[in-house]
């Protein structure tokens, strides 16, 4: 028993990871069968938030308390997350998507290939237009990069043209999109990308 696509969602604290998972679940759930695993160090805050929003039936959202570094729980020792994913796949077989949301981490975050099939890394404009050129596995190696909160660019003095040029250079042809998850801008691009990755649909 397995899901057709396990999708990892990582990024710094406050970049929009949970908002992305919420938005994708709402957009996809009428057509696809979905489950979610969230990660927090000492709580199940993100899972509880999504459950309260009723984006999916409660049993399809599981929170994992990692008790330590968010990066370790998705890379070096992903057993807690792997078990949560397998439990959901057994309970709700067949599934089209399982989203695994990492706890907030730095630019070095990356998922174990044993845990997910592809990864989305989310950064946001409010951190400054220098972020893409700082690189790191999240920027350069993720399957899809999202630069979120583009509506804040003027307020924080970030130049989107600079971010675009730097991202194109750092990504070397890999896909990425500007998004504003609050308004829904760019979400259609993300959905099209994900649906295209699912085999046999």
Curated annotation (Swiss-Prot):
Keyword Transit peptide belongs to the record: no
Pfam family, one: cobW
Keyword hit for Acyltransferase: no
Family: Belongs to the SIMIBI class G3E GTPase family. UreG subfamily.
Subcellular location: Cytoplasm
Oligomer status and interactors: Homodimer. UreD, UreF and UreG form a complex that acts as a GTP-hydrolysis-dependent molecular chaperone, activating the urease apoprotein by helping to assemble the nickel containing metallocenter of UreC. The UreE protein probably delivers the nickel.
Name of the encoding gene: ureG
Keywords: Chaperone, Cytoplasm, GTP-binding, Nickel insertion, Nucleotide-binding
SUPFAM superfamilies per record: P-loop containing nucleoside triphosphate hydrolases
HAMAP family: UreG (MF_01389)
GO molecular function: GTP binding; GTPase activity; nickel cation binding
Main localization, broad class: cytoplasm
Name recorded for this polypeptide: Urease accessory protein UreG
Residues that bind GTP: 11-18
Function: Facilitates the functional incorporation of the urease nickel metallocenter. This process requires GTP hydrolysis, probably effectuated by UreG.
